């Protein structure tokens, strides 16, 4: 049986990246909350340089 988690960096960035967070009001709320908490990495995009 195939496992449910088949990692792909492209999908990860498209779903959880900075630009997708900025695209919706709720996503911007997530970023604001993470900034307020002092997170070093706001989104998964921060792990990728390019």
UniProtKB/Swiss-Prot annotation:
GO cellular component labels: ribonucleoprotein complex; ribosome
Record-level GO BP terms: translation
Gene3D superfamilies registered for this protein in UniProt: 1.10.287.3980
Cystine bridges: none
Pfam families assigned to the protein according to its UniProt record, in alphabetical order: Ribosomal_L34
Recorded superkingdom: Bacteria
Keywords: Ribonucleoprotein, Ribosomal protein
GO molecular function: structural constituent of ribosome
Family: Belongs to the bacterial ribosomal protein bL34 family.
Protein name, UniProt field: Large ribosomal subunit protein bL34
Organism: Porphyromonas gingivalis (strain ATCC BAA-308 / W83)
Classification of source organism: Bacteria, Pseudomonadati, Bacteroidota, Bacteroidia, Bacteroidales
Recorded name of the encoding gene: rpmH
